[in-house]
Amino acid sequence: MPKTVITPPGTGTPIAPFSPGTLADGIVYVSGTLAFDKDNNVAFPGDAEAQTRQVLETIKSVIETAGGTMEDVVMNHIFLTDWVHYAPMNKVYAEYFPGDKPARYCIQCGLVKPGFVVEIASVAHIGKP
């Protein structure tokens, strides 16, 4: 199965060996996405709303680079460091998914660096039926 690595223009170097996204058979797999600043530091430490917005903008960029839109998202995997971030994350999340909602799950866990409070990985189906 052929696959294409998706790296939006202006994307920084990942802190680990992975691609921002991979397109295979009309499906875009977006890696777990965190709110990094341009220097690979934590952006908006502890701010769930600001981090969620940046994360979803990054995910949107990956999907659009692959030829899709946020309406093509079929699944989101959400990771929060604490349940106090659930409501602020959902507030921003609802702005990006105003119509039919994709499937999702949300778990509480530790993240790669202190200050990160939200991570999201997504799957979007951009292929034609």
UniProtKB/Swiss-Prot annotation:
Keyword Hydrolase: yes
InterPro entries from the UniProt entry: RutC, RutC-like_sf, YjgF/YER057c/UK114
Catalytic activity: (Z)-3-aminoacrylate + H2O + H(+) = 3-oxopropanoate + NH4(+)
Secretion signal, residue range per the UniProt entry: none
Entry annotated with the keyword Metal-binding: no
EC number(s) on file: 3.5.-.-
A GO CC term attached to the entry: cytosol
Coiled coil regions in record: none
Molecular function terms from GO: deaminase activity
One of the GO biological process terms: nitrogen utilization
Pfam families (alphabetical): Ribonuc_L-PSP
UniProt keywords, alphabetically: Hydrolase
Enzyme class: hydrolase
NCBIfam families to which the protein is assigned, alphabetical: RutC (TIGR03610)
Biological role: Involved in pyrimidine catabolism. Catalyzes the deamination of 3-aminoacrylate to malonic semialdehyde, a reaction that can also occur spontaneously. RutC may facilitate the reaction and modulate the metabolic fitness, rather than catalyzing essential functions.
Family: Belongs to the RutC family.
Name of the protein: 3-aminoacrylate deaminase RutC
Originating species: Caulobacter segnis (strain ATCC 21756 / DSM 7131 / JCM 7823 / NBRC 15250 / LMG 17158 / TK0059) (Mycoplana segnis)
Gene for this chain: rutC
